[in-house]
Amino acid sequence: MASTICFILWVVFVTDTVWTRSVRQVYEASDPEDWTMHDFDCPRECFCPPSFPTALYCENRGLKEIPAIPSRIWYLYLENNLIETIPEKPFENATQLRWINLNKNKITNYGIEKGALSQLKKLLFLFLEDNELEEVPSPLPRSLEQLQLARNKVSRIPQGTFSNLENLTLLDLQHNKLLDNAFQRDTFKGLKNLMQLNMAKNALRNMPPRLPANTMQVFLDNNSIEGIPENYFNVIPKVAFLRLNHNKLSDAGLPSSGFNVSSILDLQLSHNQLTKVPKISAHLQHLHLDHNKIRNVNVSVICPSTPTTLPVEDSFSYGPHLRYLRLDGNEIKPPIPMDLMTCFRLLQAVII
């Protein structure tokens, strides 16, 4: 399952990168005489690639306003300008928009006209990173699949903001100003298909409440989280990647079962205050525990049990799946305990 997720995300990233590079190559190599085919509706501040009639490039132009968007446009690039507002009018004909990049502007919540974004019924990707937002914008179109809000000043999530975003799969709120009081028990209600949640680099002291059941990737690095409630992972039974690096987790703050959650494949707990290795699942493949206060590794506690009736050859398939273990930056002294290697027979790398 994890490899499938990574492959999908990698394909999306590579596809976007290659597509963008191809447009720029076309721009550099194309004959200016060919540009006239779309000049009739192309905003004079922007570039309309002749080989990609559904793309509109208006980035790095010093724009203070969004130009009128032609109806044929699917992909809109407006990053790195001086735009402060998102009014309805420029988008009144842009009924086909799938992708909007407004990163690195000066947009505030007060500058977003109420229906400007929600009227875009086919919008899938919305990038508003590096702006001046203080709360998650609302309302948003139901069609939205990815919402990128990193590096703003977001400290509030108005009630009901996500209630109709059932198609959203990725929510990026990293590097904002979120506190625990930004969340209600029903904050994430409606995000039925959310797969990745990134709230790294905020000011959280507690785990966010009641995450959507389908969430598979949770990134909470660089907060001030001190503990994890008992049975917290019961509501997110599909979580596979969990990052809690650079927090304030201690042994007393962990659930009694530790991280013995069968769905978790990659667990990152670097730079915390742990003094012992927590319990883990036999399905875990990558464990990062570097830069804690761990003095020794009690293998009898952390080694997931394997049925003794299994033949030796089957123990590799049904036994612990741990392949990568980081313990450097602790108070552990080599050599590596032999019973650690005996328990985790699939280990490919151990860093102490």
UniProtKB/Swiss-Prot annotation:
Keywords: Disulfide bond, Extracellular matrix, Glycoprotein, Leucine-rich repeat, Proteoglycan, Repeat, Secreted, Signal. This is Keratocan. May be important in developing and maintaining corneal transparency and for the structure of the stromal matrix. Its main location: secreted. It comes from Bos taurus (Bovine). It is found in: Secreted, Extracellular space, Extracellular matrix. Belongs to the small leucine-rich proteoglycan (SLRP) family. SLRP class II subfamily. The keyword Disulfide bond applies. Residues 33-71 form the LRRNT domain. LRR repeats lie at residues 72-93, 96-117, 122-142, 143-164, 167-180, 193-214, 215-235, 238-258, 263-282, 283-304. Disulfide bonds join C42-C48, C46-C58, C303-C343. InterPro entries: Leu-rich_rpt (IPR001611), Leu-rich_rpt_typical-subtyp (IPR003591), LRR_dom_sf (IPR032675), LRRNT (IPR000372), SLRP (IPR050333). GO terms for cellular component: extracellular space. Residues 1-20 form the signal peptide. Binds three long, highly sulfated keratan sulfate chains in the cornea but short, non-sulfated poly(N-acetyllactosamine) chains in other tissues. Abundant in cornea and sclera but also found in other tissues. Glycans are attached at N93, N167, N222, N260, N298. It holds the Pfam family LRR_8.
